[in-house]
Regions:
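A conserved mid-domain beta-alpha-beta active-site/ligand-binding segment of alpha/beta enzyme cores
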Residues: 164-234
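A short glycine-rich, Lys/Arg-flanked "PGG" loop and its adjoining helix->strand segment in the class I
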Residues: 121, 129-148
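A short SAM/SAH-binding and catalytic strip from SAM-dependent methyltransferases
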Residues: 111-129
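Conserved Class I S-adenosyl-L-methionine
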Residues: 210-271
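Conserved acidic residues
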Residues: 45, 111-112, 149
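Class I SAM-dependent methyltransferase Rossmann-like catalytic core
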Residues: 1-45, 49, 54-56
Length: 271
């Protein structure tokens, strides 16, 4: 008797599935702006929306936004809950598909992008490095003229006003981005509640991320006179002051969007 082949179990656990239209718009726009050239260079750029949740909105929107910079991009939504995959199937079309799976990333290609938003919040901090390594190992490798695929892992509030994410390449973590709707912000440290799992428990004295948010609040307070020109101008002035002491990697074009990106090494946990 021939043994019946078994399908490996997906790696990971079911998330709450909370999602909303446009929840991940800030992350999508950042990806399109900073990773668009890599996507255009790829022969078959596949992006994975990992853990898209109870409805397929974020995968649908990711495809639309990526195609503004890479018209041949494709998106595969991956969910560990079979019922969510079945519910998303009617939304499939050219360039958009849905698959049952988890951190193993059940696509034949090495993806140019893996987006994992609000997935790791339910995991222990000690599990993050292993998940990152597994996902980075699935990315398209670096090559001549290419830095390889990109993993974007982070957390946001329910309607996407406040978001913090880590960007990683095949080699590991690169940067941390803080993004917000500026009108919703009282002070930059309000973003602390949306730190990704690798950092949220490190927002304590003695840790780099705590020092960064402390300095950001001080720069924000010092920039108070710019508030008369609007929250955007105040944010931009505060970020400009931050660059004196912190390795900010972006510039005014991204700051105007309510963003600031810092090298991972500057914020990485100690010990």
């Amino acid at each position: 008797m021939t043994a019946r082949a078994t399908t490996p179990r997906p790696v990971g656990t079911v998330t709450r599935g909370t999602t909303n239209p446009n929840r991940l718009r800030r992350m999508d726009r950042w990806i399109a702006a900073t990773h668009g050239a890599e996507l255009r260079r790829a022969v078959d750029p596949v992006a994975v929306d990992l853990g898209y949740g109870a409805a397929p909105w974020t995968a649908v929107e990711l495809l639309a936004r990526l195609r503004t910079v890479a018209p041949h991009a494709r998106v595969v939504g991956v969910e560990i809950e079979p019922a969510r995959v079945a519910a998303a199937k009617p939304y499939e079309r050219e360039g958009l598909a849905f698959r049952h799976g988890g951190f193993e990333i059940p696509v034949p290609q090495r993806p140019s992008l893996i987006r994992a938003a609000n997935v790791l919040r339910q995991y222990d901090e000690a599990q993050v490095a292993e998940v990152w390594a597994r996902l980075c190992g699935r990315l398209a490798p670096a090559g001549e003229g290419s830095r390889g695929g990109l993993l974007v892992e982070g957390t946001c509030d329910e309607i996407g006003r406040r978001h913090v994410w880590v960007a990683l390449g095949p080699e590991g973590p690169r940067t941390v981005t803080f993004a917000t709707r500026l009108g919703s912000l009282e002070r930059p440290s309000d973003l602390a509640e949306r730190l990704p799992k690798a950092l949220i428990h490190r927002n304590v004295p003695g840790e780099p991320v705590h020092a960064f948010l402390r300095d950001f609040d001080r720069a924000w307070a010092a920039a108070a006179p710019y508030a008369s020109y609007g929250a955007r101008q105040r944010w931009m002035r505060a970020v400009r002051d931050l660059t004196a002491d912190w390795p900010v990697t972006d510039g005014p074009v991204r700051w105007r969007q309510g963003e600031v990106t810092v090298t991972w090494g500057a914020l990485a946990p100690r010990g």
